[in-house]
Regions:
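Acidic, glycine-anchored loop motifs typical of Ca2+
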Residues: 42-59, 141
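Sec/Tat-exported extracytoplasmic proteins
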Residues: 22-29, 64, 71, 127, ...
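Short, glycine/acidic-rich hinge or "gate" loops at secondary-structure transitions
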Residues: 33-42, 76-80, 141-144
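General structural concept
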Residues: 19-26, 39, 44
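Beta-propeller domains
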Residues: 145-178, 186, 190-193, 198
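Carboxylate/His-rich catalytic cores and anion/metal-binding grooves
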Residues: 55-82
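Short, solvent-exposed loop/turn and secondary-structure capping segments
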Residues: 30-33, 78-82, 136, 298-302
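Aromatic (Trp/Tyr) and acidic
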Residues: 1-16, 25, 50, 83-133, ...
């Protein structure tokens, strides 16, 4: 799994969610990059040493392994894997130095669980998507991801709109992974809900719409999409950058442009007549510092209008977070 920058927690949504995003980059764009050697068994990573394997798929593996291992150990998803003391949290240096690696001593990390159906179904959606791209790269892990996604979809209760939204997303990803009629029929049965909640469902429903080709369903979705189109137009008008930098989440000025731009890519791909590519370019240009204003620092290390000297990393001693 991955740590946040300057943070020593591993959250299940960070692990599965990031692995899913990278998986979708591979699936939709054929993204390939090989500049790193990664040996999971020996726990060795060497940068600038290609190993003949797609780095993106190896990163997908990295995220999936921690989620699958947690499931196999606990029989459920973990919520977070955290260092137990404030002193460890404020640690300067590599995370591996938190512990003496001897089981049972007080420096071991704690594993937290929770009863959160929405998050569990969200992870089910992500694992189903991950399973598709891991086929042929790590077939055992791909099968584990799909099996866990199926089980979570089957056993997780659904009693509010957010949970149902995540269940529909899980069904979409499971259908795309398996082509099984049960998942297809579940999504089709939720047509009215999907249309009423198009702001939340629109970004992921297009791939299903195209894959299934149900005329009645397609007409209903297209009728609902102008509401989502208007939402993005409203967001674009809120700042000189063409993207909102903040919708209440003040912990990072890059999350909203990334999240909304990523979702918009799927809307443009599925319905290009309704969603022009402009918003995608606005999001990318904002992240690269190519926008009005004095501060044109890029959010991505090494590229953009003005690149920051400090690399983005986890070690607080490097001031890299």
């Amino acid at each position: 799994g991955w740590h946040d920058a300057g943070d020593y927690d591993l959250r299940v949504e960070s692990q599965a969610g990031e692995a899913y995003i990278l998986a979708m980059a591979c699936e939709n764009f054929g993204a390939y990059w090989d500049e790193t050697s990664i040996d999971f068994e020996k726990r060795i990573v060497e940068i600038h040493q290609p190993d003949g394997k797609n780095d993106l798929l190896q990163q997908v593996e990295n995220g999936a392994l921690t989620v699958v291992a947690g499931w196999k150990a606990l029989g459920r998803l973990y919520r977070g894997i955290l260092c137990p003391t404030v002193r460890q949290y404020a640690h300067l240096g590599d995370a591996s130095a938190h512990t003496d690696h001897v089981s049972g001593t007080a420096d071991d990390r704690w594993v937290f669980t929770e009863d959160n159906p929405g998050r569990e179904l969200q992870v089910a959606a992500w694992l189903a998507g991950i399973s598709r791209v891991l086929k042929g790269h790590n077939d055992t892990l791909a099968a584990d991801c799909l099996e866990i996604a199926r089980e979570l979809f089957k056993i997780t209760r659904c009693d509010n709109n957010w949970i149902l939204t995540t269940k529909v997303h899980a069904a979409v990803e499971l259908y795309l992974a398996t082509k099984e009629a049960g998942y297809r029929d579940f999504v089709l049965q939720q047509q009215d809900f999907i249309c009423k909640n198009i702001r939340q469902t629109g970004w992921f429903i297009g791939r299903f719409d195209q894959a299934v080709g149900n005329v009645r369903f397609s007409k209903a979705i297209r009728k609902a999409l102008p509401e989502l189109q208007a939402m993005y137009q409203e967001y674009s008008s809120k700042t000189p950058y063409g993207v909102p930098h903040d919708r209440g989440n003040r912990s990072s000025g890059s999350w909203e442009p990334q999240h909304l731009g990523y979702n918009y890519c799927y809307l443009h791909a599925a319905y290009p007549d309704l969603f022009t590519p402009d918003y995608i370019f606005n999001a990318v240009q904002y992240l690269l510092g190519m926008h009005p204003g004095r501060n044109q620092a890029a959010f991505v290390t090494g590229v953009g209008a003005e690149t920051m000297k400090a690399a983005y990393g986890v070690n607080r001693a490097d001031w890299s977070y």
